[in-house]
Amino acid sequence: MLKFIEKIFGSKHDRDIKRLWPIVDEINEHFESYKSLSDEALRGKTQELKEQIKEHISDIEQSIITEKKQLENLELTIEEAESIQEKIEGIEKELHDATEEALNEVLPEAFAIVKETARRLVGKEYPVMGSTNIWNMVPYDVQLIGGIVLHQGKISEMATGEGKTLVAVLPTFLNALTGKGVHIVTVNDYLAQRDKEWMTPIFEFHGLTVGAILGNMPPYQRKEQYACDITYGTNNEFGFDYLRDNMAGDPEDVVQREFNYAIIDEVDSVLIDEARTPLIISGPVPNADVNKYNEIKPRVERLVRAQQNLVAKILTETEKAIKTPNKADKDAEFNIGLGLLRAKRGQPKNNKFIKLIGEPNAARFMQTVENEFLKDNARRMHEVDEELYFSIDEKNHTIELTEKGREFMTDTHEDPDFFVLPDVGTEISKIDSDATLSEQDKVQKKDELYRLFSVRSERIHNVSQLLRAFSLYTRDDEYVVQDGKVLIVDEFTGRILPGRRYSDGLHQALEAKEGVKIEGETQTMATITLQNFFRLYKKLAGMTGTAETEASEFFEIYKLDVVVIPTNKPIVRKDQEDLIFKTKREKYNAVINKIQELQEKGQPVLVGTTSVDVSETLSRMLKMKHIEHNVLNAKQHAREADVVANAGHKRAVTIATNMAGRGTDIKLGEGITEVGGLFILGTERHESRRIDRQLRGRAGRQGDPGTSVFYVSLEDDLMRLFGSDRVISVMDKLGHQEGDVIEHSMVTKSIERAQRRVEEQNFAIRKRLLEYDNVMNQQREVIYTRRRKALEKRRLRIEIFDLLRDYADKHAEKFYQALDKDGLEEQVLRELSVDIKLTVDAFEKLGEDGIADKIYNTAVDFYKRKEELLGNDIMAQIEKYSVLGVIDQKWREHLRDIDDLKEGINLRAYGQKDPLLEYKQEAFKLFVDLLEEISTETLSFAFKLFPQQAAERATFIPERSRVRQERLVAQHEVAQSAYATAAPAAETTTTAKAADAARQQPPAAENEEQKRQPVHVEKTPGRNDPCPCGSGKKYKHCHGRNA
C-alpha cells in the first residue's frame, strides 16, 4: 500500500528535492549573470549582501543594546533585572527569526557568488597540508541542493565521493555574512586543518576570516580562531572549550562566542555513535589506591578458572545427552536445554558451547528452558545460576557473583561475609535500640558500620570489574596492549583511541588483567553530553553518507530532518545478497577462496572485518596461500595512507577493520573499471546497518563500477546473540551440510531483524541517557548561567543584597520561632561578621519581619562602610571571587554526589521503583541543597573577605585556571548502569592532552602518522597573571608578549 501511494505522490525525499529545484534554477540564473563581473565587482556583491542583512536586523540589535545598558544600573532590584533579562531573551528570539528571514532572501545570490568564485579558482595552485593542491571544483546542481538543505538546519545524506566538503562551503559562506560565526565540526584535527586550508581560498576571496581549533592550541590562540567568521574543529574541542569557559576565572579567559550555527560532518558518527559518551573534564582523586585491583586479581583468576572447568564439565555432559538416541524424551530435552543455558550464562564465548548450539534442535531446547525460567520477572533464574560461580548476561554486559562464587573467593581464615554488604538499615536500628551503649559509643559504632559498608562495596565493585575484564573484554577485539598500555579500539572505526579510558574502574581492571601499570582514578569537575552540547546552537545541520536508517532518532532527539540528496551520476555498484555459513571456519575458507578468485581476475578487493583478531586470522590464512595483501587495523594504523592509496590498484588485496569504512576515498587504478571496479567483501555484519552501508560505500563512487557482498556465519556475535535460532531451524529443514552456503531471503531478513533489534536497543540506551542527562542539563544551565553573569558583570552588589534579603528572612523566621535571640546574634556574627545588637525587648517587639529588616539594614550599612573603606575596584573583585569560587567548589561537590547517586540508582528497581523517577527526585533534592549552600557561602565570603584574604583568593582563582590547563583531564565517558539496561558501546574516558594523538590522525591522506604520547604541560603563567620574572607587569605585557 505504501509503495502504491509513493508511486502516485512520490516519496518524502522526492517531495523534499522537488521543492528545492526552483531555488537551484534561481541560483544558476544569478551565476550566469555574475560571470561578466570583475573580481572587485564580485566582492562588492558580497558586501551588498552583508549590508542587506545588517539593514534587516539593525533595529532589533539596537533594542538589545539599549536593554543591556539598563542592566548596568546598580540601583536595579533583582526583580527589575530579571524582567529586563526576560525582555532581552524575547528580543533575541525575534532577532534570530529576522536573521533567518534575511538569509533566505539572499540565499540564491550568495550561493551563486560561491559557485562563480569556485569557477574562477579552477586551475589555481595553493598549499594544503604541505602539498600543492590544484583547485578543480565547481558545485553541481545536486551539491547546491545539499547546501540549501544544510542552511535549512537539516541533515544532508550524500553518497561517497559527492563532495560534502565543498557542499558545506555554500551555507557556511551564507551564514558567515551575519558576522556571528559558523562552526564546522569534523571527526579529527587532521580533517579540521585540511578542510580549512582546502576551502580557505573561496572565503578569503571575499574577505571572510577562517580559523581552526586544534588540540594543542593555547587558550589565547583558541580565542583568535573562534573570533573568525568561520571556525573548523572537532566535536570534542568545541565541547571541552565550552566546559573550560564555564570554569574560567576571568572574562578574558573565555574563548568561545555565542553558539550560532554549526555544520557537523559525519553527523551520524558524532550525534549517534558518540552520543553515549559524555564529555567530562576531571581532576585527580587524592589518595586513590590503584593497587586494590592487583591485590584481588589472584582470587578472581582462580574463580574464572574454576568457572571455565565447571562449564567444560557441563558441556561434556550435555554433548553426551545430545548424542544419545532418547532426544524425544521431554526430560532429556529439558536437561539438554538447561545444560546449554548454564553454559551460556557461565561462559557465552566458549567454543564448544557455540558449536553445540548449532546442533539440530539444541537452540530450541535452550530457548524453551530459558523462557520457562524467565517467567514472572525471571523469578526462578537463580535456580540456573546457583550452580555457577558467577553469571554473565552478555547482551546487557553485566556479571553477577553468586553465593557459590562468594564462598569460593573467601579464604578459610577470613570472615565468611568478606564479600557481603552489611544491611545498614537493620544494623543502625540495632545500635539505636541497644540500651547498653552510650551516645558516644553509638556514634562510634555507626561510623565503623559506614566504614565497613564502604570497604566491602568497593571490594565487591572491584571484583565485578575484574570479572568483566576477564569474561567480557577480549584482547585484540575491544582493546589492544601496546608499549605497556591498554588502548581501546573504537568499535565503529577500528581505530585506536589514544588517551581514552574505560570508566568506573574498568580500565584499571583491564590493566591489572594484562599486568601493565595501573593508572590513577579521576573525579568529575564538569560534564555535558554531546546531545545537550549541540542543542546549544541556534541552528544545527549535518551531512553524512548514512543517516536515513536513523532518521527517526535524529528527529526525535535533535529535531533534525534527513533529506537524501540524489547523486550527480547514478550508482552502478552491485550489492549482492548475504552468503550465510554455519561456522566461522566455513566462512573464512570461503572468503579466502573468493579473494584468490578475484586476485586471479585482477580485480582489487577490500575485505572488511570487525576486529583486529579477525583481520590477523585472515592475514595468516592468506600467507599460507602465498597471496600478497595489506592489513589495515588498529595495530598498523601508521601505514593507513599508503594502504588506502593502493587499495584500488590491480590485484590489490586489502584487509581492513572498520577504519577503512569512513572518511576514506579509494580511487580506482588504471584498467580497474574494465574488470568490475572495487570488490567489497564484508566478513561479518555490524550491529548497525549504517556501518555496513559505510563499508559498501567505499565502492561505486562517482558512477564507478563495483560490487559488495557480506559473508556471515551463525557463530558471528550479531547472529549468536540476536538472530540465530530461527535461522538454524531453517538450515536444518533445508538439510544443510558442512561447507554449504545459503542465500535465502528469510535468512537475510533475519539478519536485518537482528540489526534492527540492536539498533532499537542502542537507541533506547541513548534516549535513556538523554533522560538522565536532561536532569543534569537543567541544573547545569542554571549554574552556568549564574556563573557566566557573575563573570561578565563588573559589580555584583545587586545579587549580594538579594541573597542578603533571603538570608535575613530565613534566619529571622527560624530564630524568632525558637525565641533564640543569642543564637541569632551568634550565627549572623559568625557567618557575616555583622553584630546586630538586639536587646531582649527589641527581639520580642520587632517580630519576625522587624528582625529580618534589622538584619538586612545592619548588614547593608556594614557592607557600604566596607565599600567606602576598600573602594569599588577591590569590592568588585571580592564579589566576583566570592561568587565564582563558591559556585565552582560547590558544583564539583555536587557532581561527585550525582556520580554517587547514579552508581546505585538502578538497585531501586528491585524495590519496584522506577530508577529514573527516583533519580530525578533525589537529584532535585541535592540541587536545592546546592543552591542553598551556594547562596549562604557566597554571602559569607562577600562580607568576611578583606584585602589580605582577597589578595590570597585573587591568586587562588588564576591558579585554578592554570591547574585546569595542566592537571585536569578531558574525558569522553559512557553512561554506566544508571543510564542503560543494555551494553554500552564503549565506556570510555578521554585524556585531553593524550587525545590530541587521536585527533591528529588523518583518515587516509598523510604519508606517516606521527606517533604521539600523552603530553604533560609544564606550568605556564596565564596571559593576565603576574609575570614570573618579578617585574610586577602582567605576563602578556612582559615575557609573554611574544608567546
Swiss-Prot record:
PANTHER family: CHLOROPLAST PROTEIN-TRANSPORTING ATPASE (PTHR30612:SF0), SECA INNER MEMBRANE COMPONENT OF SEC PROTEIN SECRETION SYSTEM (PTHR30612). SUPFAM superfamilies: Helical scaffold and wing domains of SecA (SSF81886), P-loop containing nucleoside triphosphate hydrolases (SSF52540), Pre-protein crosslinking domain of SecA (SSF81767). ATP binds at Q143, G161, E162, G163, K164, T165, D665. Residues 1033-1043 have a biased composition (Basic residues). GO terms for molecular function: ATP binding; metal ion binding; protein-exporting ATPase activity. It comes from Chloroherpeton thalassium (strain ATCC 35110 / GB-78). CDD domains: DEXDc_SecA, SF2_C_secA. Its EC number is 7.4.2.8. Keywords: ATP-binding, Cell inner membrane, Cell membrane, Cytoplasm, Membrane, Metal-binding, Nucleotide-binding, Protein transport, Translocase, Translocation, Transport, Zinc. This is Protein translocase subunit SecA. Belongs to the SecA family. One of its GO terms (cellular component) is cell envelope Sec protein transport complex. PROSITE patterns: SECA, SECA_MOTOR_DEAD. It is a peripheral membrane protein.
